[in-house]
Design a protein with these regions (language model features):
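Aromatic/hydrophobic pocket-lining residues that form π-stacking "cages" and hydrophobic walls in ligand
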Residues: 70
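Short glycine-/polar-rich loops that comprise or flank the Walker A/P-loop
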Residues: 23, 51-52, 77-82, 125-129
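Conserved GTP-binding G-domain of TRAFAC-class P-loop NTPases and closely related GTPase folds
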Residues: 1-4, 9, 91-138
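Generic beta-sheet signal
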Residues: 1, 53-57, 81
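Short, hinge-like loop/turn segments at secondary-structure boundaries
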Residues: 42-46, 74, 99-103
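Conserved substrate/cofactor phosphate-moiety recognition/catalytic segment
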Residues: 9-55, 60-65
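Conserved phosphate-donor/acceptor-positioning beta-strand/loop module used by diverse small-molecule
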Residues: 77-96
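Conserved nucleotide-binding/hydrolysis micro-motifs of P-loop NTPases
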Residues: 31, 62, 87-92, 137-138
Length: 138
């Protein structure tokens, strides 16, 4: 499963509530100081899939080119891959992000940089399905 959405869109919160104990959660946020986090993430995902584990990739994954390698890994493992699109208004994401503490807070330029690249996922990319999670009214 590949999560797609801005920082502050609710990806990690949703994962904790909806997938507690059922999926291995892989996030580049787990290795904030690591070099080549993208390569490390792909290796961890591949290893987990090879073990037969259900995996959720909890990152922004804003554009098709960011998601392509993850889709290829799942297909290579013979696993259908699903996207979950967090359709949260940017203003809500910015407000949630501003309330975060420490490393969890992303600089506004980072959030808006992600927004500039954000393309909703599509089955045309190779996802078996795309589910949508909308933000609760604020």
């Amino acid at each position: 499963m590949v999560l797609v959405g801005l920082q502050g869109s609710g990806k990690s919160t949703w994962t904790a509530a909806a997938l507690a104990g059922t999926h291995a959660v892989v996030s580049k946020d787990h290795w904030p100081n690591a070099r080549r986090r993208e390569v490390r993430q792909r290796r961890v995902v591949a290893d987990l899939l090879a073990e037969g584990r259900s995996v959720v990739v909890d990152n922004t994954n804003p554009a098709p080119e960011d998601r392509a390698a993850l889709i290829a890994l799942a297909r290579g493992a013979g696993v259908p891959v699903r996207a979950v699109w967090f359709d949260t208004p940017p203003a809500v994401c910015a407000r949630r992000n501003a309330a975060r503490q420490g490393r969890a807070r992303v600089p506004p330029a980072g959030l808006y940089g992600t927004l500039a690249r954000l393309v909703p996922p599509s089955t045309d990319e190779g996802f078996a399905r795309v589910d949508v999670v909308r933000a609760a009214p604020a």
